[in-house]
């Protein structure tokens, strides 16, 4: 486990594969640490295992899930089993849009989870960080998020097509974590972004730094980075399991 300073604000990648996990990979999942407060952002398959490399489940403070697609929420069910039968925790806070509850309606979570439904424009304090959600351009209700602490801000696009602007998360993004699911040739075919579109969106938002995530297995990651850099006008980094950035 990694110790975290009281005033630190960081992002650690637990999984970044787009839509399905590649060999040895994991889908969307991130650990956002604001001081000593630990938030699990996205619960894609494979990410609960990686989460426990950094924080024991007894010390996890909350989970945030952007939408109902399985590559972003399926490990919630594993978390339920762990908390209910092994850790012994109740009323664990889980922030989700309404669609996640509808998708899991047939599951019986009892009092293990404290479901906190959020929607467009809503804000909440998670430890010392203020989180704000904005609806994106995706087939189901999907919420991008801004997490802000002590004048530093993380902007997370979640899944989105180009009809939504990262700038809707507000000015002053210290670090933008933006999906880049598509090859450039596939732009416009589905409601996702290419690396080029992600770079352009981050540039329009005035983000200081850009990290690409949700890259589909099989895509050329280095080509994606180069396309994003050309559009962003500054160096771009790629999300990978275990990478950590101070915000």
Can you say where each PLM-predicted feature lies in the sequence?
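Active-site environment of divalent metal-dependent phosphoester hydrolases
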Residues: 20, 70-73, 103, 122, ...
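Cap/insert and terminal regions of metallo-dependent hydrolase folds
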Residues: 163-246
């Amino acid at each position: 486990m990694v110790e975290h300073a009281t005033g630190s604000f960081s992002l650690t990648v637990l999984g970044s594969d787009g839509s399905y996990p590649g060999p040895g990979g994991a889908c969307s999942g991130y650990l956002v640490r604001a001081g000593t407060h630990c938030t699990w952002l996205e619960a894609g398959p494979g990410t609960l295992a990686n989460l426990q490399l950094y924080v024991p489940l007894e010390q996890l403070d909350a989970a945030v899930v952007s939408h109902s697609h399985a590559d972003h929420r399926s490990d919630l069910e594993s978390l339920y089993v762990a908390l209910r039968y092994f850790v012994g925790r109740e009323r664990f806070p889980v922030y989700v849009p309404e669609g996640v509850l509808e998708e899991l309606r047939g599951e019986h979570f009892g009092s293990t989870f404290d479901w906190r439904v959020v929607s467009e424009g809503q804000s909440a304090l998670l430890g010392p960080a203020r989180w704000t959600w904005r609806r994106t351009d995706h087939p189901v209700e999907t919420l991008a998020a801004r997490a802000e602490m002590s004048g530093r801000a993380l902007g997370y696009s979640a899944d989105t097509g180009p009809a939504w602007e990262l700038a809707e998360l507000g000015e002053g993004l210290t670090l933008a974590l933006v999906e880049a699911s598509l090859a450039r040739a596939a732009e416009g075919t589905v409601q996702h972004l290419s690396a080029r579109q992600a770079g352009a969106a981050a540039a329009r938002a005035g983000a200081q730094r850009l990290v690409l995530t949700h890259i589909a297995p099989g895509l050329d990651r280095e080509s994606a980075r180069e396309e994003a850099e050309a559009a962003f006008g500054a160096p771009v980094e790629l999300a990978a399991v275990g990478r950590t950035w101070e915000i």
